[in-house]
Each structure stands twice: as structure tokens, then as C-alpha cells.
């Protein structure tokens, strides 16, 4: 339904952010979290990172995809492109390259911006490309992740452990998935403008992969019930 209609992607944006980072970055590089990661927008999902924190790009990508950290998204954008505006240019270039021509990205995390939008079909194209990357699938299917963060600027706590839980309720086990189907990986999203969103890759019992996308669901529980129904239908 309405696969070409303009929608707000919210944090499903991070699928593209992760894909670009995997293509352009070195997973073992140590990245320093910039001041721009100190996001104070109410309700903003965070990975509990502070400016000056140091962690590898690989760890940052878990911080991006597991707890949906907007702070991690900013840090990745600065590492790859120097700032988030330049990173957004890379996002739009990549989207165009994949044929996602009815999208425009203005930031790496998906916080509300009138100039930041996509369509279900474009999001399918982007996610379909992302799941060709084994590292992407590995990161985006992880229910929980912990890592050690270092910060030389923090005299009281130069080293600490951060732990993240995936917001995808199918991965956390909060909701059961369709019979004879297994969740491959996915990304959630939510803002008032975008509603509740979920982009999901799943594997059927016969090994076939499917992609299911729901955007702008008004109710959290309804999103997961609808997604389970959608995934069940793909086998009929």
C-alpha cells in the first residue's frame, strides 16, 4: 500500500547511516565522540555517549543500531564526513545511486526535519542493499551489546562500560514473530511525525529472505501485530 507516498523515516534513517559507514570507514578505527553528539532533544534515543568518549567505529555502529543512539549517529557522521551536513550529502548521493529518488536526508539520525523524508519503496531499496553486507546484518540483529568506552577528558571516570538493548521487540523477545519465519535483522523508528516504524528482514523456513516495512503506525503494539501478519502473508 502507498509505497511511493512521502513518509518520515525517523530512526530507520540509521540503516543508510550504517551502510555508508561500513562502505567508507574502517571498523577498527578509534573515533572520538564530538560535541555535536550532545543532543538535548526531548525523547531522543541515545547510546549514553559523552563528548570526548573514544570507541571503535564497530562499537559505534552497535551504538547506532542497537539502542538507536542519535549521539552515535552524529559521531559517525563527523568521523566519515567532518560534519553531519556533509554526511547528509553522502546519504543523498548513496540513495540516488540505489534508485531511491523520492527521498531526501538532512541528518544521520532521523530526528524531525521537514527536509528529511523517504518512501516505503526507497527504504526497501536502501535496506535491500544494506542486508547484502554481512557486517550490517550481524550488527542489526544483535539483541544486546556492551563495550568499554575511554574518555581522557573525564578525570573521575576515564573508562566505563556501556550496555545497550535493542529496541526491536521481536529481537528482544517482547513479541513473538510469525510461525516458520525468523527475524534476520531490522531497524525501528519513532517520532510524533513519523509514527511507529519498522523495517524488517526475515528468513522463511525454506531459506527465502523477505523484507517487510511498516511506516507511520499510530500505536506501538499495533506495529508489531501488523508486522507479524505481513510476514505471515509472505509465505502464502
Give residue ranges: language-model regions.
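Active-site-adjacent loops and short helices of periplasmic peptidoglycan-processing enzymes
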Residues: 1-121, 130-131
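Penicillin-recognizing serine hydrolase domain
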Residues: 83-236
Amino acid at each position: 500500500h502507498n509505497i511511493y507516498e512521502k513518509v518520515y523515516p525517523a530512526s530507520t534513517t540509521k540503516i543508510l547511516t550504517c551502510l555508508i559507514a561500513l562502505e567508507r570507514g574502517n571498523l577498527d578505527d578509534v573515533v572520538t565522540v564530538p560535541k555535536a553528539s550532545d543532543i538535548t532533544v526531548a525523547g531522543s534515543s541515545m547510546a549514553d555517549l559523552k563528548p570526548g568518549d573514544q570507541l571503535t567505529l564497530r562499537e559505534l555502529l552497535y551504538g547506532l543500531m542497537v539502542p538507536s543512539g542519535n549521539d552515535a549517529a552524529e559521531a559517525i557522521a563527523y568521523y566519515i564526513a567532518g560534519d553531519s551536513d556533509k554526511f547528509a550529502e553522502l546519504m543523498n548521493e548513496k540513495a540516488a545511486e540505489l534508485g531511491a529518488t523520492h527521498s531526501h536526508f538532512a541528518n544521520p539520525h532521523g530526528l524531525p526535519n521537514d527536509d528529511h523524508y523517504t518512501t516505503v519503496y526507497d527504504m526497501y531499496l536502501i535496506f535491500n542493499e544494506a542486508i547484502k553486507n554481512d557486517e550490517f546484518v550481524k550488527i542489526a540483529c544483535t539483541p544486546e551489546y556492551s563495550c568499554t568506552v575511554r574518555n581522557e577528558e573525564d578525570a573521575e571516570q576515564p573508562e566505563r562500560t556501556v550496555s545497550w538493548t535493542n529496541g526491536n521487540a521481536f529481537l528482544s523477545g517482547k513479541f513473538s514473530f510469525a510461525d516458520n519465519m525468523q527475524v534476520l535483522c531490522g531497524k525501528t523508528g519513532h517520532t510524533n511525525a513519523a509514527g511507529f516504524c519498522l523495517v524488517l528482514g526475515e528468513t522463511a523456513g525454506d531459506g527465502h529472505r523477505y523484507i517487510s516495512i511498516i511506516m507511520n503506525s499510530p500505536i506501538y503494539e499495533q506495529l508489531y501485530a501488523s508486522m507479524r501478519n505481513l510476514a505471515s502473508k509472505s509465505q502464502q
